[in-house]
């Protein structure tokens, strides 16, 4: 790769005694795996900056699947994520590491990711709206096109008071059936606008994104969800702001 580009570390693990194997999310090349040689050495200048949520400028080289990291510089301090916001950030990172194609440009998604982290770092009352907006944006970039505003059967605009059944590869059709794949027209309007004014629309958005992301994630559970369940105090798990992602 010629020149520098912006990137974040999605995930890293030790490689040999002194190196790190990193999954990066870069502005121009999307998800890239790099080997950071000597990054774990005691005197390495990279030791402190190759952490999740730290905005970086990076350069790498190589033609294989694993590149060699040549340089990395922090653009600023790491975004301050703590508590449920930290686990939410880890969830977003794991999601990207699992579903993004290798070395594919997602430059617009890069900024959606940055905005999501900034919202989480602002320590708002709940991470849920930012997570749902990001998931919906991600689905769009993955090619998961859904028309939330029209009935797939009739083509008519959805009505707030009617119920619609979601069917994969078809969209939403008017239905009297009420189950996990049923959504009101009011909820569909919220999904289309990515604005969630109440608990009901937030829960509906979570149901939809879980249904839609399942084919991309397969049967393997997300580790960040399990970490959240293990380490967040049980009292918080019942609160809307601390529900598993």
From Swiss-Prot:
SUPFAM superfamilies: ArfGap/RecO-like zinc finger, Nucleic acid-binding proteins. GO terms for biological process: DNA recombination; double-strand break repair. Signal peptide: none annotated. One of its GO terms (cellular component) is bacterial nucleoid. It holds the Pfam family RecO_N. Transmembrane segments: none annotated. InterPro entries: ARFGAP/RecO (IPR037278), DNA_rep/recomb_RecO_N (IPR022572), NA-bd_OB-fold (IPR012340), RecO (IPR003717), RecO_C (IPR042242). Keywords: DNA damage, DNA recombination, DNA repair. NCBIfam families: reco (TIGR00613). Involved in DNA repair and RecF pathway recombination. Belongs to the RecO family. This is DNA repair protein RecO. The lineage of its organism: Bacteria, Pseudomonadati, Pseudomonadota, Gammaproteobacteria, Enterobacterales. The gene is recO.
């Amino acid at each position: 790769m010629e020149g520098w580009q912006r990137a974040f570390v999605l995930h890293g693990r030790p490689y040999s005694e002194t190196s790190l194997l990193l999954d990066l999310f870069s502005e121009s090349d999307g998800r890239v795996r790099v080997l950071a040689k000597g990054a774990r050495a005691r005197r390495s200048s990279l030791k402190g900056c190759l952490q999740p949520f730290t905005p970086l400028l990076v350069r790498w080289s190589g033609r294989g699947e694993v590149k060699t990291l040549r340089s990395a510089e922090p653009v600023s301090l790491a975004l301050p994520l703590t508590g449920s916001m930290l686990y939410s950030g880890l969830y977003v990172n794991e999601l990207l590491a699992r579903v993004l194609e290798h070395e594919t440009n997602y430059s617009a998604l890069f900024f959606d990711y940055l905005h999501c982290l900034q919202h989480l770092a602002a320590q708002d009352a709940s991470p849920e709206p930012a997570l749902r907006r990001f998931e919906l944006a991600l689905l769009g970039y993955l090619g998961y096109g859904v028309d939330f505003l029209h009935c797939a059967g009739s083509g008519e605009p959805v009505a707030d008071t009617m119920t619609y059944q979601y069917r994969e590869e078809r969209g939403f059709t008017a239905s009297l059936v009420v189950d996990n794949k049923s959504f009101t027209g009011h909820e569909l309007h919220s999904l289309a606008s990515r604005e969630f004014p109440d608990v009901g629309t937030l829960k509906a958005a979570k149901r939809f994104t879980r249904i839609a992301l399942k084919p991309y994630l397969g049967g393997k559970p997300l580790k960040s969800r399990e970490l959240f369940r293990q380490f967040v105090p049980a009292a918080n798990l019942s609160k809307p702001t601390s529900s598993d992602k």
